[in-house]
Amino acid sequence: IIMYKIISISFLNVFLFGANLEIGDTAPDFRLKNQDGVFRKLNDYRGSKLVIYFFPKAETPGWIKQACGFRDEFDNFQDHNISIVGVSFDSEEDLKSFKEKYSLNFDLLSDTDRVMGNAYAVNKWYFFPSRKTFLIDESGILIHIFDDVNLHSHSDDILKYFNHK
């Protein structure tokens, strides 16, 4: 009975929160609508490096700082063939409004069903994904995970990682 309970709890954790990803894993595929209602999937970014960052909620002070950091460094990311995608559980409409308000120059994906959040194991809280960033290489392999995100220097930290790789 004890073994059954352990297996049941383990299965429940994976079901609710996703399996932990590790460096070298193939990045989980996704198919989500962006702020304009256009479906995006992992394969759309094949051939370039990809930053996928999860954020709790649009219009929160921390996320504004983080998003604007990516916006301000966008040309540097492009120079290194790096695409950027932000993901939250917000609606397409909320993300569109947020993108326009802050003149963001990259896609925001709406994961209202928490499918991508589960695949990337960021569903720490039901209503908000945990703040986590995944770096993926040109062939779709996970090469780095930022578990601790410094909102003030996050875009610079990512660029430094790629410059030293």
Regions found by a protein language model. Name each.
Residues 42-65, 70:
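Short active-site neighborhood of thiol/selenol oxidoreductases, capturing the structured segment around
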